[in-house]
């Protein structure tokens, strides 16, 4: 049984691609049709590729892989943080700092500074410092937490990276590829899939779509770590909606 059903994908709006004028021709094989100026993603492929992504992530997690979730746009930020945390993994959901992976040593120094400031507060150092200095330290901590809080406890560069919208996260993807880190990604019709190891063709602009895919990959990690099926609810009618019905839905929604 597929880890995500056609019905779930439809309800989350995963089938909606970008306007046809904004497409990347390299995504042509993942597009079923065009309706009302919008590309319609071939969800039959999404179902199969989501299965592949699930299996890959599950197996990686079973081997104690460090997995980094990346999604910095507003539609992805909350799901990326919530699901990575639920799976006991790591995330970046604000601006990607150049060199996060390729200059890991420098990033570790910034993380060490974040931990130092937290320790100063816990040990009562803030109580004996001038208010102005404490305010500056709090400002520094807030900024460091915003950009690095999700990887504060990451023990090493990741073994796998999951990305929402590789078109936006091009720098992150390039760093991963430079270091040989496999990338699993939600790829919309405007993106270049060439640098992605496991592509999940999907609408990466809808919050529900991002949440659905991201949660399933978090489930895969949990299953891999536990060595048993995660508590995932599957739809029994996996093939309840055909690709032809998807077109009808799109036409109705864009009427």
Swiss-Prot record:
The keyword Ribonucleoprotein is assigned to this record: yes
List keywords of the entry alphabetically. Answer: Ribonucleoprotein, Ribosomal protein
Query: A Pfam family for this UniProt protein?
Result: Ribosomal_S2
Molecular function terms, GO-annotated: structural constituent of ribosome
GO CC annotation: cytosolic small ribosomal subunit
Identify its protein family.
Answer: Belongs to the universal ribosomal protein uS2 family.
HAMAP family, from UniProt? Ribosomal_uS2_B
Protein name (database record)? Small ribosomal subunit protein uS2
